[in-house]
Structure formats: structure tokens, C-alpha cells
């Protein structure tokens, strides 16, 4: 406890000296802190360099804080907001967990390497572990986006079949598969690095993956193949949505089977009852015929919801593509061209491009905030320390209606409506009749629209 107190005191002294621009500090605050705690000697393996070389890089701490905080807000929103409880948002929450771990475990160590001019300042056995975590979370990000793209395409293409396998448990199983693939890609790195340090060190000082075969195979498995699948399925999703919208606009959509009691007569004569029902396939009422010809509002609204959600996810895909492609393309070129390329230039480009990729982990919450009202409202509440979900207004339900169907009365009940309110039409009240209880009726307009609306709450 005494050693820890001395270490903290030493760290604060050096930090205050830095803030007042006393540049004669020979040992960095972080180096002094860790050195005092572990009390390492010059002959040990754990030895810091002489001092920090790049103090302006500390400004990157702002990016790290925003990345961690933004993704925590996403995780809280999906956990607390019932409107966000669907398969796509579960994937987005898992993606936010991966991005948050990038900010917690990967970006700080990368910043530390920059501060020491890319000379690894920590124990050498931590280098392959850090590279493995970097590959794990980067692979998890692209795999999540690929899985989201596939899941949404299947949901829009075959909504009924997808709804049978779209429970919360099935979504968790899909997410577990994504993480299993990501772990499988990253696990070989510490094994390779601990066996041969040359595979994870360049010039015996810089911690970077130095195995050409693994770089090539890993780049294709973890990035280019999932990226190709993601782009193809996203384009197919947009194509299906456009085709469905055009079919609705031109009236070439098949109406679902429905129950339509067009004409119901209840007669009571001399103790006998007769029921006559008109042919449901014939409709002589012109107003009713016009209503039939209208397009289903639920289906069109569902397609609009899907298109809005696809735009948001499309922006996420595009940002990921733009911010990670430079790194992976440069990584492949540095291996393929070998000594023919300027390796120092390649290293500098990779150092810049990898941080552009890291920034992508902090941009996704910003995309959700700008383009989704539910996320925006949730983030605003959480920043004001309001963690309770908003109470929904009471739902207006139709009371039970007691209708007396007189003898000879014409009771017209139309069940196929876009609301839950049955429609009772004219009656002849000259003769006594029977009493009917009309309950609340809830019939879906279109099964595909119901499924689609449940999916597209992004």
C-alpha cells in the first residue's frame, strides 16, 4: 500500500511538472508509475524506453473517451428501450460491445506505442495478446455488419419463414456464431507470437504482426470476404424493397385472405330462425368497392420503415468500408510487393490508416443519433441521468357494443379494416330480434407487413 501511494505521488509530481511546461522531465509519468509499482531493474525484460517522444499524441485520449462513452450509450439504449428490442438492434448492441472494447483495450495501448515512437514499452509477452485483441474486435465488427446484412435480406425476402426463427434466443445464437468466428481468426496470433517473437516484432522493438502468410489469409477471411457478402446482400435488399414498392404503387400486390361478412340477416318468425348470407365474392356497394381497390397502408408503411432502416445501416456500412479499406489494402500491398515497395512509407501509412479504422468504432453512435429518433431521445435522456423509459399513453380500446339485431334487420359487419374497430351499418328496427355482443377484433392486414415492422426498428 505504501509503494502504491509513493507511485501515485510520483505520477502526480511528474504530471504537474508537465502541465507547467517543465520540460526537464527525464522519465514519463506513465513510465514512472509502472516502474515504481513493479520495481523492475535494468537487467529485467520489463524496461521502459528513456522517455516519451510524442506528447501531442495525447490528444487522441479524446477519441478514446468518446468511443467508449458513445458505445456505452448504445448498449444502454438497446437494453432499456423496448422499441429497440429486435434482432437487428441486438446485433448493433453486440457491435457496440466490440467497439467499446476497442476503446478500452486496444486504443490505449496503441496510443502508448505512439507516445514512445512505436517502441513497445510493455512486457514483450503482451505484444501478441494486444495484436490478438485488435484482430478479434476488428473482425467482430465486420462480421456483425455482415450478419446484419444477411439477416435483413432474409427477413425482407421471406418474412414469414424468418419470423419463425427470429426470437431473442435465435438472435443470441447468431451473435455467438459471429463471436466464435472472430475468436477463431484471432486465436492463432498469441500462439505464433509466443513461439517466435520475430512474428510479432519488427526490428526487435515495434509490436506489429510480421507474418506475411497470416496477414494475407487473415485479411481475406476477416475483411474482404465478409465485405463482399455484405455489399451483395445490401444491394439485393435495396432491390427487393424497390420491387415491392413498385408493385404496391401499380396495384400488383396479392391481398391476403380475409374474412368479410358483407351481409347478415337475422330473422325470427313464428319461433323459427333463418340466416341468409350474401355471397362474399360479390359486392354491389360502390363505396366498399373503392375501399377494396385501395392499397394496404400497413404494407406500404412497413416498406417505408425498411427503407429508412436500410439507409441508416447503409451509412454504417459505407463508413466502415471507407475507414477500414485503406488499412487492409495497404496491408496486402506491403506483403505482396515486399522489398520493391518503400517499407518505411508503408509503415507510416499503416500507422495512420489503423487509427482511421479505430475512429470508425466511435462514429457508429453518432450515425444512430443523427438518423434515428429513438436512439437520439434515449441518448438525450441518459446524458441527463434519466434512465427510466418513457411511459406510454394508455391505449384507447373500444368498449363492448350491444347490438340488437331485429327481425328483418340488415346488420353489415366488415371485419377487414386497418383499425381494431368493427363497423356496424344500417338496420331496420321494426321487428324484435336477437342480441349480439361485438368484441374487439384484431386481424393483421398483411402478415409480411407485421413481420417487417417488427424487424425494422433500427
Swiss-Prot record:
The PDZ domain-binding motif is involved in the interaction with MPDZ. SUPFAM superfamilies: Family A G protein-coupled receptor-like (SSF81321). Residues 287-297 have a biased composition (Basic residues). Pfam families: 7tm_1. Its main location: membrane. It is a multi-pass membrane protein. Disulfide bonds join 127-207, 337-341. Keywords: Behavior, Cell membrane, Disulfide bond, G-protein coupled receptor, Glycoprotein, Membrane, Receptor, Signal, Transducer, Transmembrane, Transmembrane helix. Glycans are attached at residues 203-204. G-protein coupled receptor for 5-hydroxytryptamine (serotonin). Also functions as a receptor for various drugs and psychoactive substances, including ergot alkaloid derivatives, 1-2,5,-dimethoxy-4-iodophenyl-2-aminopropane (DOI) and lysergic acid diethylamide (LSD). Ligand binding causes a conformation change that triggers signaling via guanine nucleotide-binding proteins (G proteins) and modulates the activity of downstream effectors. Residues 33-55, 112-128, 190-213, 337-347 are extracellular. Ergotamine binds at residues 139, 209. This is 5-hydroxytryptamine receptor 2C. Residues 81-86, 152-167, 237-311, 371-458 are cytoplasmic. A motif (NPxxY motif) lies at residues 364-368. Belongs to the G-protein coupled receptor 1 family. Interacts with MPDZ. Interacts with ARRB2. Interacts with MPP3; this interaction stabilizes the receptor at the plasma membrane and prevents the desensitization of the HTR2C receptor-mediated calcium response. It is found in: Cell membrane. GO terms for biological process: behavioral fear response; chemical synaptic transmission; feeding behavior; G protein-coupled receptor signaling pathway, coupled to cyclic nucleotide second messenger; locomotory behavior; phospholipase C-activating G protein-coupled receptor signaling pathway; phospholipase C-activating serotonin receptor signaling pathway; regulation of appetite. One of its GO terms (molecular function) is G protein-coupled serotonin receptor activity. A motif (DRY motif) lies at residues 151-153. Residues 1-32 form the signal peptide. The gene is HTR2C. Residues 272-301 are annotated as: Disordered.
Amino acid at each position: 500500500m505504501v509503494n502504491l501511494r509513493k507511485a501515485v505521488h510520483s505520477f502526480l509530481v511528474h504530471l504537474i511538472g508537465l502541465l507547467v511546461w517543465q520540460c526537464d522531465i527525464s522519465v514519463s509519468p506513465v513510465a514512472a508509475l509502472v516502474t515504481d509499482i513493479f520495481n523492475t531493474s535494468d537487467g529485467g525484460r520489463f524496461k521502459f524506453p528513456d522517455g516519451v517522444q510524442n506528447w501531442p499524441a495525447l490528444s487522441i485520449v479524446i477519441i478514446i473517451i468518446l468511443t467508449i462513452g458513445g458505445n456505452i450509450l448504445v448498449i444502454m439504449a438497446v437494453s432499456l428501450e423496448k422499441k429497440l428490442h429486435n434482432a437487428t438492434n441486438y446485433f448493433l448492441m453486440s457491435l457496440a460491445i466490440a467497439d467499446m472494447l476497442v476503446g478500452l483495450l486496444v486504443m490505449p495501448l496503441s496510443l502508448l506505442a505512439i507516445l514512445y515512437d512505436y517502441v513497445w514499452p510493455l512486457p514483450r509477452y503482451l505484444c501478441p495478446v494486444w495484436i490478438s485483441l485488435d484482430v478479434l474486435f476488428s473482425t467482430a465488427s465486420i462480421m456483425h455488419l455482415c450478419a446484419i446484412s444477411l439477416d435483413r435480406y432474409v427477413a425482407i425476402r421471406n418474412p414469414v419463414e424468418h419470423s419463425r426463427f427470429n426470437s431473442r434466443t435465435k438472435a443470441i445464437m447468431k451473435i455467438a456464431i459471429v463471436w466464435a468466428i472472430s475468436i477463431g481468426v484471432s486465436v492463432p496470433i498469441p500462439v505464433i507470437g509466443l513461439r517466435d517473437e520475430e512474428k510479432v516484432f519488427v526490428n526487435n522493438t515495434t509490436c506489429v504482426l510480421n507474418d506475411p502468410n497470416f496477414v494475407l489469409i487473415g485479411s481475406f477471411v476477416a475483411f474482404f470476404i465478409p465485405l463482399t457478402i455484405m455489399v451483395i446482400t445490401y444491394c439485393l435488399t435495396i432491390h427487393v424493397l424497390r420491387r415491392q414498392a413498385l408493385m404496391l404503387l401499380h396495384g400488383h400486390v396479392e391481398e391476403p385472405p380475409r374474412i368479410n361478412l358483407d351481409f347478415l340477416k337475422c330473422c325470427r318468425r313464428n319461433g323459427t330462425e333463418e340466416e341468409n348470407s350474401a355471397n362474399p365474392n360479390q359486392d354491389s356497394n360502390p363505396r366498399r368497392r373503392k375501399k377494396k381497390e385501395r392499397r394496404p397502408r400497413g404494407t406500404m408503411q412497413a416498406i417505408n420503415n425498411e427503407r429508412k432502416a436500410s439507409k441508416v445501416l447503409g451509412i454504417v456500412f459505407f463508413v466502415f468500408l471507407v475507414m477500414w479499406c485503406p488499412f487492409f489494402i495497404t496491408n496486402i500491398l506491403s506483403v505482396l510487393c515486399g522489398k520493391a515497395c518503400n517499407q518505411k512509407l508503408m509503415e507510416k501509412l499503416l500507422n495512420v490508416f489503423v487509427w482511421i479504422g479505430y475512429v470508425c468504432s466511435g462514429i457508429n453512435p453518432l450515425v444512430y443519433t443523427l438518423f434515428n429518433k429513438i436512439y437520439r431521445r434515449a441518448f438525450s435522456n441518459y446524458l441527463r441521468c434519466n434512465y427510466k423509459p418513457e411511459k406510454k399513453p394508455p391505449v384507447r380500446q373500444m368498449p363492448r357494443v350491444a347490438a340488437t339485431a331485429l327481425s328483418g334487420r340488415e346488420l353489415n359487419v366488415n371485419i377487414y379494416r386497418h383499425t381494431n374497430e368493427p363497423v356496424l351499418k344500417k338496420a331496420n328496427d321494426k321487428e324484435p330480434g336477437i342480441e349480439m355482443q361485438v368484441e374487439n377484433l384484431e386481424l393483421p392486414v398483411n402478415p409480411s407487413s407485421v413481420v417487417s415492422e417488427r424487424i425494422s426498428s433500427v
